A protein has these predicted regions:
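Hydrophobic/aromatic beta-strand patches that form the interior of the parallel beta-sheet core
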Residues: 12, 29, 56, 79-82, ...
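Hard-cation-handling environments
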Residues: 105-114, 120-243
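Single conserved hydrophobic/aromatic residue that forms the stacking wall/gate
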Residues: 295-305
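His/Asp/Glu-rich metal-coordinating catalytic cores
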Residues: 1-128, 134-143
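Generic long, charged, amphipathic alpha-helical segments
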Residues: 264-290
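A short, acidic, amphipathic alpha-helical segment used as a generic capping/interface helix at domain edges
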Residues: 223-229, 282-296
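Short, conserved loop/helix-junction motifs that constitute active-site signature segments
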Residues: 74-76, 232-236, 296-297
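C-terminal, non-catalytic macromolecule-binding modules
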Residues: 226-271
């Protein structure tokens, strides 16, 4: 821990688009990668014997039209490009309108007297879901349940949500900025409850009020989400909504694959809840993103990772 704290004290933030000299012959500049809040692609200029070459490292390239954050920026040129290609061989396809779809799922679940459990990545995806739910509440798309409670039950997700709240002007897209200009926080709303302690987490499942629970981990292999699944998978009234990729071998993959029974905390739990997956939700660009990088002017070499 002492070593980690020592490293943190040496960190220095650099704004996007500011060209910085690290030492003789080495300069860098960060561009908004549009993947997560604060994610960056790196432009690197190397000069030796009077010759300068520019190297571009993409980092994770964000998906376009994500809520809250800006789309990725693409530089005009580079001599060498090192880029990710997570979904370089496929397209995400047309995106559904998530807000009415989510409102419908919430309405049906709460009407049954159940809970909507959303396994979610703590950084990025959780805040997207809050963005959608704020709009649902603002537009009164769920009827008969007042300001139904929404729990974010993940210490990391709570910390990330606080960071989103504190860095609005720098990183929010035009839609989120327009809400801020009206005095509206894009991810906060009546009925939102942030759970940090284990006692607060345990209390959620002893409250019989139908509710929405957003918790990590997104693939259900660790974290508090496992407790919420144990309390809700056996209930026909409840719904589990997956909003991200589920890797092979994970509990989340087993559930979207139709598992009728799963093991949680050494106990077999019957799967009676409604299992739903939102298509196309990804923080990574599909093939359109990497292709945009290959169109840079004057590139000599492109390396896919």
């Amino acid at each position: 821990m002492e070593d980690a704290l020592g490293v943190i004290r040496l960190l220095e933030g650099i704004p996007y688009h500011q060209r910085v000299t690290l030492s003789d012959g080495i300069q860098i500049r960060f561009l908004d990668a549009g993947h997560l809040l604060g994610s960056a692609s790196i432009e690197l200029w190397l000069t030796e014997d009077g010759v300068t070459k520019k190297l571009l490292f993409s980092g994770d390239i964000g998906n376009i039209h994500q809520p809250l954050i800006n789309d990725p920026e693409y530089p005009e040129s580079a001599d060498y490009v090192i880029m990710e290609s997570t979904y370089g061989d496929r397209s995400h396809g047309p995106k559904p309108d998530y807000v009415p779809e989510l409102a419908k799922i919430i309405q049906e679940t709460l009407d049954r007297g159940g809970n909507l459990v959303i396994p979610s990545f703590a950084v990025g995806r959780t805040q997207e879901m809050l963005y959608f739910i704020r709009e649902i509440k603002a537009e009164h798309l769920v009827h008969g349940h007042g300001e139904f409670p929404v729990y974010v039950d993940s210490p990391l997700a709570v910390e990330a949500t606080n960071i989103f709240r504190d860095h609005q002007k720098e990183c929010y897209d035009s839609d989120a900025a327009a809400l801020l200009a009206q005095g509206i926080n894009p991810i906060l709303f009546p009925g939102l409850k942030l759970s940090i302690t284990s006692d607060e987490s345990k209390a959620i499942n002893f409250n019989e009020t139908p509710k929405v629970i957003i918790s990590a981990s997104g693939m259900c292999d660790a974290g508090r989400i496992k407790h919420h699944l144990k309390h809700n998978l056996w209930r026909q009234e409840s719904t589990v909504l997956f909003v991200g990729y589920q890797a092979v071998g994970t509990l989340g993959r087993a559930l979207i694959g139709g598992a009728k029974e799963v093991k949680l905390f050494q106990e077999e739990v019957h799967v009676n809840a409604h299992i739903i997956q939102f298509p196309g939700m990804s923080g990574h660009a599909d093939q359109e993103g990497p292709v945009s990088y290959t169109h840079l002017r004057a590139h000599e070499t492109v390396l896919d990772l």
